[in-house]
Swiss-Prot record:
Its EC number is 2.7.1.33. Its main location: cytoplasm. This is Type III pantothenate kinase. It holds the Pfam family Pan_kinase. Keywords: ATP-binding, Coenzyme A biosynthesis, Cytoplasm, Kinase, Metal-binding, Nucleotide-binding, Potassium, Transferase. The active site is at residue 109. Pathway: Cofactor biosynthesis; coenzyme A biosynthesis; CoA from (R)-pantothenate: step 1/5. GO terms for biological process: coenzyme A biosynthetic process. ATP binds at residues 6-13, 132. It comes from Bacillus cereus (strain ATCC 14579 / DSM 31 / CCUG 7414 / JCM 2152 / NBRC 15305 / NCIMB 9373 / NCTC 2599 / NRRL B-3711). Catalyzes the phosphorylation of pantothenate (Pan), the first step in CoA biosynthesis. It catalyses: (R)-pantothenate + ATP = (R)-4'-phosphopantothenate + ADP + H(+). The gene is coaX. Belongs to the type III pantothenate kinase family.
Length: 262
């Protein structure tokens, strides 16, 4: 059984794969202040709830865009699982040809998504990941990672509205009954949702025009389903794209180490 861990700025998503299939997954808040023991006890409870234990896990891979948390997570893996985790970063074999000016600047989550997207859906491809920041990644027909776009996530946009406009309340981000709001809450819901949908459609349209291709558009992340239901540019929603990519990277690197006799 392989344990995969994707650490984002707001949430961390954990999963266990058995024989190539995602058996279970969990989401928890990213906490930069937790120790390896606190993370260890939390993961222990999650595993035990599914009838699993640390001993059932034979390999671990971690992707993180929050560097300060990595020390605690690596110590947790070594102390409780007795396994040194594979970390997505320099030295890991991805199979990607990254055409960024500085490939090291590409976030681990974007690399993992690209690996999974190419394997599952082919190329050319645009991957939209709705996280704390929303990222757009373009992979051309030759399976080269060409770059992308980074924008504030929908929650950051909403937080800016609450914090800068004193009389506006915090609201649930959901589809309103009509575009034209009849009260403050519905007007805000409409503005946040449809404003963001417009951003997604505009950016995807411009990316396609610049690429002079019709790449398939894959969406992932917490709000992918909500946005895709209101947009005509998203072809597929895959909520577990990142976890699948982590598993694929683990298998690729484990097989390479086996071939080298390590």
């Amino acid at each position: 059984m392989i344990f995969v861990l994707d650490v984002g700025n707001t949430n961390a998503v954990l999963g266990v794969f058995e024989e190539g299939e995602l058996r279970q997954h969990w989401r928890m808040e990213t906490d930069r202040h937790k120790t390896e023991d606190e993370y260890g006890m939390l993961v222990k409870q999650l595993l035990e709830h599914e009838g699993l234990s640390f001993e059932d896990v034979k390999g671990i891979i971690v992707s993180s865009v929050v560097p300060p948390i990595m020390f605690a997570l690596e110590r947790m893996c070594e102390k409780y699982f007795k396994i040194k985790p594979l970390v997505v970063g320099p030295g890991i074999k991805t199979g990607l040809n990254i055409k960024y000016e500085n490939p090291r600047e590409v976030g681990a989550d974007r690399i993992v998504n690209a690996v999974a997207g190419i394997h599952l859906y082919g190329s050319p491809l645009i991957i939209v990941d709705f996280g704390t920041a929303t990222t757009y990644c373009y992979i051309n027909e030759e399976k080269h990672y060409m770059g992308g776009v980074i924008t504030p996530g929908i929650m950051i946009s909403a937080e800016a509205l609450y914090s800068r406009a004193a009389k506006l309340p915090r609201i649930e981000i959901t589809k309103p009954s009509s575009v034209v709001g009849k009260n403050t809450v519905s007007a805000m819901q409409s503005g946040i949702l449809y404003g963001y949908v417009g951003q997604v459609e505009g950016i995807v349209k411009r990316m396609k025009e610049e690429a002079r291709q019709e790449p398939k558009v894959i969406a992932t992340g917490g709000l992918a389903k909500l946005i895709s239901e209101e947009s005509n540019v998203i072809d597929i929603v895959d909520p577990f794209l990142t976890l699948k990519g982590l598993y694929m990277l683990y298998e690729r690197n484990a097989n390479l180490q086996h071939e080298k006799g390590e």
